[in-house]
Amino acid sequence: MYYPINEIFQTIQGEGYYTGTPSIFIRLQGCPVHCKWCDTKYTWKCNNEDQISYEKIIMKKKSNRKWSYMNVKEIILIIKIKKWTAKHIVITGGEPCLYNLLEITKELEKEDYKCQIETSGTELIKCSLNTWITLSPKINKKTLKTSILRSNEIKYPVLKKEDLFYLNSILKKIKNKKHNLIFLQPISQNEEALNICIKTCIIKNWRLSVQIHKYLKIR
């Protein structure tokens, strides 16, 4: 299977449960969610005029709308050519679950990688059983119950106090599932949002995710 790849790079995971973990990011093109505050708007559309060769994907220095169709063998080849040492792989987007991720996650596991998918939960999740699912629900799009139940952690973006109402409605749907890993993440390092997240995390015994890669000014 071929996937529309926007970029592949090695860095440190800056969000959620795996914060601080050396990771290889595989960013897929295409997203129907369109959050106003999204910091990867260049992944929204999969326009033919933006398609380039996969060799050029390797050379990308800056994030942009350019993408390339790549199969799993080509993706693994790039990782080996680059001699990247991280063993944790983050499949993100865009919305990666627009695509069937079963093949890519299984093949990467055969190469001794641990896979993580970052998803809004608006699409069916198709991946290996061992893949770690980071669910990031969005108020403007319905979150599938199957996605909520499959998730290993919920990483919820917060801008104002009212945003927490939607999270509470989601948690009610899975009241029979013990979900210890709930992260609140202030949007765009907004100070008011940060204070809301800190106070709520303390009250609820949830966790705080602050996107450390942005503070460290790394990719």
From Swiss-Prot:
Q: What does the entry list as the binding residues for substrate?
A: I12, Q13, G14, R27, T92
Q: Which UniProt keywords apply?
A: 4Fe-4S, Iron, Iron-sulfur, Lyase, Magnesium, Metal-binding, Queuosine biosynthesis, S-adenosyl-L-methionine
List ligand-binding residues for S-adenosyl-L-methionine.
Answer: G94, S136, P137, K138
| The EC number(s) this enzyme carries | 4.3.99.3
Give residues annotated as binding [4Fe-4S] cluster.
C31, C35, C38
Keyword flag Kinase: no
**Which top-level group of life is the source organism from?**
Bacteria
Instruction: List, in alphabetical order, the GO biological process terms annotated in this UniProt record.
Output: queuosine biosynthetic process
Which pathway features in its UniProt record?
Purine metabolism; 7-cyano-7-deazaguanine biosynthesis
Looking at the record, the residues that make up the Radical SAM core domain are: 18-219
Which Cys-Cys disulphide bridges does the record give?
A: none
Catalytic activity, as annotated:
6-carboxy-5,6,7,8-tetrahydropterin + H(+) = 7-carboxy-7-deazaguanine + NH4(+)
Q: Which GO terms describe its molecular function?
A: 4 iron, 4 sulfur cluster binding; carbon-nitrogen lyase activity; magnesium ion binding; S-adenosyl-L-methionine binding
Locate the residues binding Mg(2+): T40
Q: Which Gene3D superfamilies match?
A: Aldolase class I
Q: Which cofactor does it need?
A: [4Fe-4S] cluster; S-adenosyl-L-methionine; Mg(2+)
The note on cofactor binding and number reads: Binds 1 [4Fe-4S] cluster. The cluster is coordinated with 3 cysteines and an exchangeable S-adenosyl-L-methionine. Binds 1 S-adenosyl-L-methionine per subunit.
Which InterPro entries does its entry note?
7-CO-7-deazaguanine_synth-like (IPR024924), Aldolase_TIM (IPR013785), rSAM (IPR007197), rSAM_QueE_proteobac (IPR027609)
Q: What does this protein do?
A: Catalyzes the complex heterocyclic radical-mediated conversion of 6-carboxy-5,6,7,8-tetrahydropterin (CPH4) to 7-carboxy-7-deazaguanine (CDG), a step common to the biosynthetic pathways of all 7-deazapurine-containing compounds.
Q: How does it assemble?
A: Homodimer.
Protein name, UniProt field = 7-carboxy-7-deazaguanine synthase
